[in-house]
């Protein structure tokens, strides 16, 4: 195990076949690769599902050895990225390139862009789109203006499953010769909530700090409550046992976890807890309201106790 290269880069997919995507998306990408017309793309999905890696693999496949000259990547989340739109894109599109290949521009995190920026890009697509493929990645495609959506194919990436992430992490552990147990990897999957990038970063942090991967070490390095404690609180809420549920919550608070992380853990556990879908959604709504209050600076323990009371009250409505 060496610490010279971040694992998120070391284990980034190199080819399209390396990206974890479902068969339907894979077929659509293959159609895109074979399409002789200049088709533009919007790739949308949760963080860490491989959107940016997919675009880089597409560029490598289409451009080959010309990738350094024919591929431009702009991250809209950076101020530099927004300023690059008017100063870098037109010159890039105008420069002479291989006659049989289209240049490719990736606009990463495009849903962060203002409408004005997006309209500017739409005008550039109209002007340069015959010889340049524009590809957008975003978490929420509804924040991309209709003018751009109407001229793009939209690929919707699903959130990665725990099993998919677990398999990928186990391969990394074997390659890096890191001792691990299944509980440790499952805990990383739980914390990452479908985000491969976060899961690999958490794996590397734990491995470099402790040189092995176990549940307790992962929880320690990631500073999140034990999901079993959260599960116990939810179980006690289902039994209307406020006193015991609050006691466990107090024990969690004493371990100095961030209130925001405590509440977020409830959402992770509720998503997989065995209950009716209707009740699950109502309880998650209560937890989300508590998250909003905490994000506004209302961080007293009363917020957490109040949340437990509201969860119990909501559960009792079904009795």
From Swiss-Prot:
It comes from Acanthamoeba polyphaga mimivirus. ATP binds at residues 45-52. Coiled coil: none annotated. CDD domains: AAA, HLD_clamp_RFC. Part of the RFC clamp loader complex which loads the PCNA sliding clamp onto DNA. Belongs to the activator 1 small subunits family. RfcS subfamily. GO terms for biological process: DNA repair; DNA-templated DNA replication. This is Putative replication factor C small subunit R395. GO terms for molecular function: ATP binding; ATP hydrolysis activity; DNA binding; DNA clamp loader activity. Keywords: ATP-binding, DNA replication, Nucleotide-binding.
């Amino acid at each position: 195990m060496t610490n010279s290269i971040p694992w998120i880069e070391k284990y980034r997919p190199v080819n399209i076949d390396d990206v974890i995507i479902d068969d339907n998306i894979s077929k659509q990408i293959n159609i895109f690769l074979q399409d002789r017309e200049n088709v533009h793309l919007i790739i949308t999905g949760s963080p860490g599902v491989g959107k940016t890696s997919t675009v880089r693999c597409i560029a490598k496949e289409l451009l080959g050895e010309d990738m350094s000259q024919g591929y431009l990547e702009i991250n809209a989340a950076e101020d530099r990225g927004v300023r690059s739109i008017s100063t870098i894109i037109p010159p890039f599109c105008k420069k002479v390139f291989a006659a049989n290949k289209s240049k490719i521009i990736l606009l990463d995190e495009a849903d962060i862009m203002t409408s004005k920026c997006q309209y500017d890009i739409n005008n550039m697509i109209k002007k340069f789109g015959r010889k340049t493929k524009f590809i957008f990645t975003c978490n929420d495609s509804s924040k991309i203006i209709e003018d751009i959506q109407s001229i793009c194919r939209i690929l919707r990436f699903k959130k990665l499953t725990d099993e998919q992430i677990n398999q990928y992490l186990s391969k990394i552990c074997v390659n890096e010769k890191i001792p691990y147990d299944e509980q440790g990897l499952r805990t990383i999957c739980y914390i990452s909530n479908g985000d491969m990038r976060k899961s690999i970063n958490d794996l590397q942090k734990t491995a470099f700090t402790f040189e092995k991967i176990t549940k307790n070490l992962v929880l320690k390095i990631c500073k999140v409550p034990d999901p079993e404690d959260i599960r116990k609180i939810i179980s006690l809420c289902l039994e209307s046992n406020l006193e015991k549920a609050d006691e466990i919550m107090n024990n969690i608070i004493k371990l100095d976890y961030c209130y925001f992380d405590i509440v977020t853990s409830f959402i992770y556990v509720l998503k997989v807890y065995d209950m009716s879908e209707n009740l699950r959604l109502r309880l998650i709504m209560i937890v989300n309201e508590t998250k909003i209050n905490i994000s506004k600076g209302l961080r007293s323990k009363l917020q957490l106790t109040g949340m437990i009371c509201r969860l119990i009250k909501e559960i009792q409505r079904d009795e």
